[in-house]
Structure formats: structure tokens, C-alpha cells
Amino acid sequence: MVDFKMTKEGLVLLIKDYQNLEEVLNAISARITQMGGFFAKGDRISLMIENHNKHSQDIPRIVSHLRNLGLEVSQILVGSTVEGKENDLKVQSRTTVESTGKVIKRNIRSGQTVVHSGDVIVFGNVNKGAEILAGGSVVVFGKAQGNIRAGLNEGGQAVVAALDLQTSLIQIAGFITHSKGEENVPSIAHVKGNRIVIEPFDKVSFERSE
């Protein structure tokens, strides 16, 4: 299910396609324990998950789990192993895990991915080609483009807000939209009536939770 591979990309944690995230987390812990003193605290690795799009919502929990075990994820790879050559990877794309802190005081550039298990606040822009994976809500004090996935731990109560919400994709829990907010108008995306709606900040009407 999980294994570490030494490749030209460096040390990669390869996670096969799976059905149960808890089983994956337990397998990671067991594999690291089995490897004894191979790792030192703070060692950096790459992460590749087969069927990446299916499991992208699990990345914050996996990254957080690895951090609790003393390992830092430096980049996320999208691709697969080469048949007959287990230590060779066919990498389709790679993104740098730029920050795991919840307050970011800079622009998030194309090719960078921010992963955090809670809320993420960005004082800057999120450029096209960038991605945020957040367990909670995402608030951008700037222009938000690229992909923003929120509520991956918190669920449908999470929101995505920006001074200019021009994202390529917004995901909140299991809901996805490619809609954008009104240009240059502070807006909030939230789940309402089992879909994501985007409303101006001064006109937002949240769905009441029971």
C-alpha cells in the first residue's frame, strides 16, 4: 500500500490507490517504524499518490501525519511508476509544498502548493497554476486564482473568501465549482443548498446549520 522509493527525484513516499485513509496512515506509521533509525527529524521527502485526483482531498491529513512523524513533504508529484522499473517514476507534474503555516505573507506563485490541516490566510495573491489544500477555510487578502480546495477536514462549513475571487476551481468538502466571483468585488464562496454559491461580501447569506 505504501513504500519509500529512492529515485532520481530523491526519496519518494509512494502510496498506491486505496479505499480507506486511516489504513494508509497506519501503514505509513508502520513502515517508518519498520525502517528504524533511517530517518532523522526534519528529513524532506516527496509524495506521490496513485490516482492523484481521486485522493487530493486527503493530502493535508497525509502531510500533517508525516510531519507528526518527523518528516517534511517538499513536493507533491503526479504520475506513476514505470512498469518493470519500480524505482523509476513517470512524473507528469510536480508542485512545491511552499508553506505549511496557516498565515502566509507573500504571493503564492504558479507551481506552488500550500498544504495545511486547518484554516489558511494569505496576505497576497494566489496566482494561476497555484493550489491551496486546506482542512478548514481559506481567506485571501488579494486576488485568488488557481485552485483552492477547502473544508477537506472541516467539511461544508468551510468558506473560501478573497478580495477578488477569480479562481479556476473551488472545492469545499465534496462540492466543486468552476464559477468565479464578480471581478474586483470582495466575495465569499460557501455551501448552500448542496452546492457552492459565490456572493459579494456585503450580501452574503449563509445557510443555517441545524
From Swiss-Prot:
GO terms for biological process: cell morphogenesis; division septum assembly; regulation of cell division; regulation of cell septum assembly. Coiled coil: none annotated. The keyword rRNA processing does not apply. Belongs to the MinC family. Pfam families: MinC_C (PF03775), MinC_N (PF05209). HAMAP family: MinC. This is Probable septum site-determining protein MinC. Cell division inhibitor that blocks the formation of polar Z ring septums. Rapidly oscillates between the poles of the cell to destabilize FtsZ filaments that have formed before they mature into polar Z rings. Prevents FtsZ polymerization. Interacts with MinD and FtsZ. Keywords: Cell cycle, Cell division, Septation. InterPro entries: CAP/MinC_C, MinC, MinC_C_sf, MinC_N, Septum_form_inhib_MinC_C.
